[in-house]
Design a protein with these regions (language model features):
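Phosphate/ATP-binding catalytic cores across multiple sugar-kinase/actin-like superfamilies
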Residues: 25-33, 209-254, 325
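Buried hydrophobic side chains on well-structured beta-strands
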Residues: 45, 215, 258-260
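Active-site metal-binding loops of divalent metal-dependent hydrolases
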Residues: 96, 124, 264
């Protein structure tokens, strides 16, 4: 956090090694894409985490290293490999916002055809995206009245620790008293946990029920906050976070669609018949709707959960969003078409 305020923090050797591995992976991908083709090239990059003040680096990252000069490092490596860029990397965008942009512009995107939709992606972490009144809104633009999922806790448990693929693995490790690294070494991730639940294993069923309950809680809060304003339903990981405003310009808006993507979406798709996650999710959401003190909300959404929710198979949504943002920025600077 101090780094974002302009106070450089020495990056540890371990972080440097992790950052170098990420840099080499990016370089390898770019070299593969550009092999045998002529440039110059335009590159868009989306990353999780808090960005540096110039938006060219990562100042803080829950599941990875700080990389304060990442964009410049990438440009330097590309130059060494004679990869010409049409323009410098304009910024490291939000992978979450890019998910929304990809869902809006992608051929099979699920933000199309509706004016108001919420997206939740679950992978290494969690990603939020929101479309209101026909516009995809960056979450940083609405942070005064809506929190990102990773910021929120319920009953002392972080939503990211329950709804991300990595968090679900950690919950299963806790239930089975198995070290997380052992599960990773065995390739035991969310799909395997769901298979265990479908086979009736109590520990896996408990984890799936926990996922379903928290997903129902979160989706109701999103709907409620958009329609009514923040109701203090959850707590924050950071107790010093400024309070959310209870009023905003979009109040009275009904969400038309929930979109669940990435590995969490895949798990829900695989669970559609077995209902290990679905039943608890639907029950929790419907219960909150039925007991809502906001009459219009209750009238509009009673028994509608399954009609609202759709699963995205657009795993490339954030990549597509990054490309669109880079091209849009380039066009605005050069008036290219």
């Amino acid at each position: 956090m101090a780094e974002m305020k302009g106070d450089p923090i020495p990056v540890s050797n371990q972080e440097k090694q992790q950052g170098q591995a990420i840099l080499e992976t990016i370089l390898e991908a770019v070299l593969e894409i550009t092999s045998g083709q002529r440039g110059p090239w335009i590159i868009g990059l989306g990353f999780p985490g808090l960005k540096t003040s110039d938006k060219k680096g990562i100042a803080a990252l829950v599941n990875g290293p700080r990389m304060p000069t990442l964009a410049c490092d990438i440009e330097l490596e590309l130059k060494k490999n004679q990869i010409d860029l049409a323009t410098p990397i304009h910024a490291l965008g939000s992978d979450a916002d890019y998910c929304g942009l990809g869902e809006e512009k992608g051929k099979d995107g699920h933000f199309t055809g509706v004016k108001n939709a919420y997206y939740l992606g679950g992978g290494t972490g969690v990603a939020d995206a929101l479309k209101l009144h026909g516009q995809v809104l960056p979450f940083d633009q609405i942070k005064d009245w809506m929190a990102k999922t990773w910021e929120l806790t319920s009953n002392g448990l972080s939503f990211e620790k329950v709804l991300s693929a990595r968090g679900i693995q950690e919950q299963y490790a806790r239930e089975t008293k198995t070290p997380t690294h052992e599960l990773t070494n065995q390739n035991f991730f969310i799909s395997r946990i769901l298979e265990k639940a479908q086979a009736g294993e109590p520990e896996a069923l408990n984890v799936c029920a926990l996922v379903g309950e928290n997903l129902g809680l979160l989706l109701f809060e999103r709907l409620e906050t958009i329609f009514c304003g923040w109701q203090n339903r959850f707590q924050f990981i950071n107790p010093n976070r400024p309070p959310l405003q209870s009023r905003h310009e979009y109040q009275g808006t009904f969400l038309e669609r929930f979109v669940i993507g990435q590995r969490l979406g895949t798990a829900l798709a695989d669970d559609e018949n077995s209902r290990c996650i679905w039943d608890k999710m639907v029950f929790t959401f419907d219960y909150l709707i039925e007991h809502s003190t906001h009459r219009e909300l209750a009238e509009n959404y009673t028994l509608r959960m399954e009609k609202l929710l759709t699963i995205s198979s657009l795993r490339d949504a954030p990549v597509l969003g990054a490309a669109i943002d880079a091209w849009t920025n380039y066009r605005s600077q050069t008036h290219a078409y």
